[in-house]
Each structure stands twice: as C-alpha cells, then as structure tokens.
A protein has these predicted regions:
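N-terminal leader/linker segments that initiate helical-solenoid repeat arrays
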Residues: 17, 21-86, 93
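Terminal, low-structured helical/coil segments at or just beyond the last alpha-helical repeat
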Residues: 2-3, 31-39, 45, 221, ...
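Structural signature of tandem alpha-helical TPR/SEL1-like repeats
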Residues: 44-53, 79-90, 111-124, 146-158, ...
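Helix-start (N-cap) detector for alpha-helical repeat units in TPR-like alpha-solenoids
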Residues: 65-66, 99-100, 133-134, 167-168, ...
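Bacterial N-terminal signal peptides that target proteins for export
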Residues: 4-17
Length: 281
C-alpha cells in the first residue's frame, strides 16, 4: 500500500478567479485546489466486515508487518486515523525499514495536524528508499501547504523523474506552475494528470482555470463543466462555472451556479462575492 491509498479529500480552498478577471486583469496569481489531493474517504474500507477480515490475517501472522500496514491503510481510507496510526506504528516496530509504512504514517500525521512528525516520516521513507515516489509526493504536498514552494516543486519533479504513474505529482506541479502564471506548463501537467486519473475532478478544474487565464473560454468552460460532472460537490468548480457565465453576461445562470457553490461551501468567499454581484439589480 502506498500513501495514495489513504489520501482523503480536503476542502477546496483555492484562489478562484475573482472579479478582477471581469475587468480583464491578469490571472497570474490565481490558482486552484491547493490541496492537490483528490481521493475520497471510503467508509467501506473501515467497515467492521473489512477490518475483521484484515484482523484475521494479522492473527494468523502477528509478526508480519505487512498485515498491519494493509489494515492501517484500510483504517485510513475509512477515516479512522487513530486506529491507522496505531497499525503503522506496529508495522514500523516490526520492520524499522518499512518505507511504505513510514510514508503512510506520515499521511495520517498530516491529517491529525502533526506536520513535524509527518515530515520526519517522509524524510525517513525516502532515506530508506530514495526511489519511492509516493513519499516525495506526500512530502511535496506538505511543503506546498507550508509555503515552501521550491522544495515542493523539487519533490514533485523528483517523483516525475522516477516515472511515477501517480496523477498527484503532475496535478501538484501544475498547481505550482499555475500560481506562477506559467499556464502553458500548467495545462500540460493537468492534461497528464487527467490521463492518469480520468475520474478526478480537480485536474479538469485546474486546467479550466489556466485555459481561462489564456482567454480560451470555450475549453475552460468544457473542463469546468466536466469537473462538475465528475464531482457535483466541488464548490470551486461551481463558482468557476458561474464566473464564466458572468463574463458572458448571463447573470441569472451565474447567480444560480454561485448559489450552488455557496450551498456546498458557505465559507467560500469568491462564490459569496460572486453571488452578491449577480443577485443585485
């Protein structure tokens, strides 16, 4: 199991396109989905039936660290983070060089808010296995959220150089390119992420924003609509769809989409501002 298997979705809190776009101002500082993580919690993985089956495997081989790593991943996918942490601890105690378990435990530490412990575990994982792409991607996400952008970029770049098939590496590097106004590079990375994870909404939303930044409104609209089709609970995508309607002068449709974005995420300020603009008059 790698770190991807226990990634959860976090709230979409990126910089959506704002009113500045409506007046034709540059988009260089805008970006989308800074979490860079687009895998849902799967409660079924943490179900009593599934855990019971995995526990039976452990009972048959209590000294096998892999059993604890697998069950820990199931707990993590089910959102049971303390139970996951305990299993990864046991896996590492049984095999101090279990680099996958370090990377998985790091992800759980991130979800529990202990970023220092997470960083230490990611560092240990890549120290044991310098070719483990999932640890570089996880550490890169940690760095990016901490504002350590160059270090984040280096980790995503390393994972890509290792020929990772994990879409997060390309998605996250694309987010960095996007935040720097390098939209052609961002579009290329988002496109690769889409080819690797065609059912993930976030790369479509990200690519749509970069298309919009390059004034390719038709492709932007198509991508953002696809993001909504894949994930109807993506508040940022609804807000971005509304922005395009607003740019086109269709205030009624814009207000409807902004309203849906606010319903999904009442704290998402770009949607709240957009709804205020389009609901007046």
């Amino acid at each position: 199991m790698n770190a991807t298997s226990v990634e959860r979705r976090t709230a979409m809190r990126g910089f959506a396109l704002t009113a500045a776009l409506l007046s034709g101002l540059a988009l260089a500082g805008c970006q989308t989905a800074p979490t860079g993580e687009f895998t849902n919690i799967d409660k079924a993985q943490g179900s009593a039936e599934n855990i019971s089956s995995l526990s039976a495997v452990i009972q048959r081989s209590p000294q096998d660290p892999e059993g604890y790593n697998v069950r820990g991943s199931a707990y993590g996918r089910g959102g049971q983070y303390q139970a996951a942490l305990k299993d990864f601890d046991t896996a590492i105690q049984l095999n101090p060089n279990f680099y996958q378990a370090y990377s998985n435990r790091a992800l759980i530490q991130r979800f529990l808010g202990d970023q220092a412990a997470a960083l230490a575990d990611y560092n240990r994982s890549v120290q044991i296995n310098p070719d483990y792409d999932a640890a570089y991607i996880g550490r890169g996400n940690l760095y990016r959220k901490a504002g350590r952008i160059q270090e984040a970029f280096n980790d995503f770049q390393k994972a890509i150089q290792l020929d990772t098939t994990d879409a997060r590496a390309y998605h996250n590097r694309g987010l960095i390119y996007q935040s720097q106004g390098q939209h052609a590079f961002a579009i290329e990375d988002f496109s690769t992420a889409i080819s690797l994870a065609p059912d993930a909404a976030e790369p479509y939303n990200g690519r749509g924003l970069s298309y919009l930044a390059m004034n390719d409104e038709d492709n932007a609209f198509a991508d953002i609509n696809m993001a909504i089709k894949l994930d109807g609970k993506n508040a940022e995508a609804w807000s971005n769809q509304a922005l395009i309607y607003e740019r086109r002068g269709d205030k009624a449709k814009a207000a409807k989409s902004y309203r849906e974005a606010v319903r999904l995420n009442p704290t998402y300020q770009p949607a709240k501002d957009g709804l205020a603009r389009t609901s007046t008059g």
